[in-house]
Swiss-Prot record:
Binding site for Mg(2+): K192, D194, E195
Chief site of localization: plastid
PANTHER family xrefs: RIBULOSE BISPHOSPHATE CARBOXYLASE, RIBULOSE BISPHOSPHATE CARBOXYLASE LARGE CHAIN
Protein name per UniProt: Ribulose bisphosphate carboxylase large chain
Binding site for substrate: N114, T164, K168, R286, H318, S370
Gene behind the chain: rbcL
Co-factor remark: Binds 1 Mg(2+) ion per subunit.
Organism the protein comes from: Bertiera breviflora
Top-level EC class as recorded in UniProt: lyase
Positions where N6-carboxylysine occurs in the chain: K192
Amino acid sequence: SVGFKAGVKEYKLTYYTPEYETKDTDILAAFRVTAQPGVPPEEAGAAVAAESSTGTWTAVWTDGLTSLDRYKGRCYHIEPVVGEEEQFIAYVAYPLDLFEEGSVTNMFTSIVGNVFGFKALRALRLEDLRIPTAYVKTFQGPPHGIQVERDKLNKYGRPLLGCTIKPKLGLSAKNYGRAVYECLRGGLDFTKDDENVNSQPFMRWRDRFCFCAEALYKAQAETGEIKGHYLNATAGTCEEMIKRAVFARELGVPIVMHDYLTGGFTANTTLAHYCRDNGLLLHIHRAMHAVIDRQKNHGMHFRVLAKALRMSGGDHVHAGTVVGKLEGERDITLGFVDLLRDDYIEKDRSRGVYFTQDWVSLPGVIPVASGGIHVWHMPALTEIFGDDAVLQFGGGTLGHPWGNPPGAVANRVALEACVKARNEGRDLATEGNEIIREACKWSPELAAACEVWKEIRFNFAAVDTLDPTA
């Protein structure tokens, strides 16, 4: 009979629709689902679709006041995971009308909201999202993008070099500025505030900004190269964050920085809009990402966080090193590096890319390799990341036995040697160590660095790995 019928009914009756053909305007999601014992995959997949869109636990009278068929999420495909009895991939399509234009915050509140605490699921992980071009076009995206950044900096044909100032906490503003000057003077393109440097009692933000700007201008005058220091504008409120960005602009520096996950997507998008309007580049640090993305069965993969960042806005984002001290498997890392840089990325499950993604005209983001890397890694980094990357050596610069400027010189010489060798057709993967040794003959600074770090390795297996193929 027609009319309202109270009670609880199975999700799959409404939300599991294997016959559904996805639309170009749908947001598509791939979830790794671990259901509770006894919950069939169709019901679990439908529950994910329901709880992340229009559904609730019981039939409600007000369902009759809207068109559920128009607004509901749909689980349209379920795929087993090879070697995992209890896991499967559920594909869900969401109609575009469910999401506010230009708001990553709203998109995530639905797709990775309450559903992650749902009792019928033991664990849930969002592996990938397909953002339709209609939704992409509602975002500004990165303030400037890769080409505009190169033009602003007048640096072409090689990766950029950076250094995080250490110790990350405890230096006075003047000593901090001195380290910035020494690194930039030695040949680096950028230095960086650590992500946890905001405005603490030992160094207030305004003092740091002033001394870093002085260091930057002095290094520029002496080297004839454009230099940058990522001034961290992250703050406790959006108003304070913008105040710091305004002061950075008044100092005339080229780039500011934000911690986009701890700061939040609303704050990040606000800052990205300010940066485009005022000609500032925006460096993004991903502090807190491993809380969300490191476990293979629960949370959200970093490729989703990377896509969200490209939509929200940032010119650089940390993306792992493959070879350093932090988590990151090569194929997976290259998968999301492409998602950050390229306009069009084909589906490629061998690199963890579940959907073809078309970014239309959204600018690209430069991936930043940072964390436990040093001069011996330079050939591998140049080969893995190519030219459009920032290679950041914190301890690998400041840990040089002769001090900061020689540490910077060693990194710049190693990079120039690798780029030259690559351009001459040499294979960096097989000849890397030899290329670095040859360069040592012309650079005592590089030779000293090579001696210090010749035995350093971080050999641990990655936690987050690709699924085996059948």
